[in-house]
Swiss-Prot record:
InterPro entries: Ribosomal_uL13, Ribosomal_uL13_bac-type, Ribosomal_uL13_CS, Ribosomal_uL13_sf. GO terms for cellular component: cytosolic large ribosomal subunit. The gene is rplM. This is Large ribosomal subunit protein uL13. CDD domains: Ribosomal_L13 (cd00392). This protein is one of the early assembly proteins of the 50S ribosomal subunit, although it is not seen to bind rRNA by itself. It is important during the early stages of 50S assembly.
């Protein structure tokens, strides 16, 4: 007699849609909760090699908070690919120009690297204000 262990498959689970309001939330604490839900760690059937996480809509990204002096001292770096092409932008400037990217960068760093992490990241939708175009999915409000 063989006792088979349970192996989750991505298609066996219904993925829910949730909406999170980022107003007044701390960036790191919010990002860890988002990454955990994208991976599916809140579910009993969690399996590390299967994408069973839910879809998340984050609204009001422009109202995110950070602690300490990170608003002025935190920088985001990227390289253009040319010699001397290292660019940096301060957190406060990034918050005014691209508020969605702040949450996306924080969450992407907490997800697995590789194809599985990329598929998990595609389930995250971030918006600077409270308007989103996913009302057809009937997202549930998630308080974090």
């Amino acid at each position: 007699m063989y006792i088979k262990s349970f192996s989750a498959k991505s298609n066996d689970f219904k993925k829910m849609w949730y909406c999170i309001d980022a107003t007044g939330k701390i960036l790191g604490r919010l990002a860890t909760n988002i990454a955990s839900r994208l991976r599916g760690k809140h579910k009993v059937e969690y399996t590390p090699h299967v994408d069973i996480g839910d879809y998340l809509i984050v609204i009001n990204a422009k109202n995110i908070k950070v602690t300490g002096k990170k608003c002025t001292d935190k920088f985001y770096y990227h390289h253009t690919g040319y010699v001397g092409g290292l660019k940096k932008i301060a957190f406060k400037d990034m918050l005014h120009r691209y508020p969605e990217r702040i949450i996306e960068i924080a969450v992407r760093g907490m997800l697995p690297k590789g194809p599985l992490g990329r598929s998990m990241f595609k389930k995250l939708k971030v918006y600077a204000n409270d308007n989103h175009n996913h009302s057809a999915q009937n997202p549930k409000i998630l308080n974090i």
